[in-house]
Amino acid sequence: MQTNEQMLSAIENYLAQTEFPAEPELLYAPIGYSLAGGGKRLRPMLLTLSCGIFSDDVKQALPAAAAVEGFHNFTLLHDDIMDNAAVRRGKPSVHAKWGQNVAILSGDAMMIYAYRLLSSVPANLLPQVLSTFNTMALEVCEGQQYDMDFEQKPKVSVVEYMHMIELKTSVLLAGSVVIGAMLGGASDEDCRRLRRFAVELGLAFQLQDDLLDSYGDQRLGKAIGGDILEGKKTYLMITAMSHADEATREMLRTAYRDPALSDAEKIGKVKSIYDRLDVPRLTEQQIQLRFERALSILDTLSVAPSRTQRMRDYAMSLMDRKN
């Protein structure tokens, strides 16, 4: 059985060895640029680890792992256009480097590349794998639409927000672990349980992202307070609004939209309100709740506990971050 570091290396090597045609250059160069951009490789790692719970042959999962990474990067290309984001992983985003039309078309080609990779799975599993992938892909689009809808919606509830991030973030993790489990020979029941594991893990991961954006360690290089400056409806903002009295809610609205405030002043004012309302602690409680639920589900799988240890270790490493 490979270590997690060896699995990640195998995924990186597989992606690096993937060849794209030289022409048309403006179609394929952005794909290679995007896939070589690094990142956590979270989704392909979850897929291969899930396969490894049920099978010692995790190499069989590499094409599907590359497929979910390709799909993830397709969503990033289009997300960056919708968000007008000029930077991705410390480098110019594809649309900033090559233009919007190129980014759209290269993203579409990356999606097709993902399907091509998936078509290599064993024929007896192909219908189930494609069904899982298609459901996952459509739900990610639904989540993105809800996220855009929230920008125009004056009030968003915690329930609505959790539903949105489940679709936008968690279902891609869930689809990845289910496909990996299928390739490893898991039962339908174990696939269902792993899906729930990944949903809970994804919710914990996204809530932690929300928290770290405002309370991460700035010494580690990431700017703090980006969500506040953008006025994004995060778990922190929504929780603050739901716990505040009307006077405090108005203070929060004013802090978000006051053009006279500098960036540092805006971040400071909003965080002081969060602190007063105990929002960081409430968020940490929800993160811990979701993460503990995820780990407890691993205990219910029909395999020896030793088979899930690498998945457990990886999940714990994801949540042990400061930025």
Set out the residue ranges of the language-model regions.
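All-alpha prenyltransferase/terpene-synthase fold signal
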Residues: M1-N323
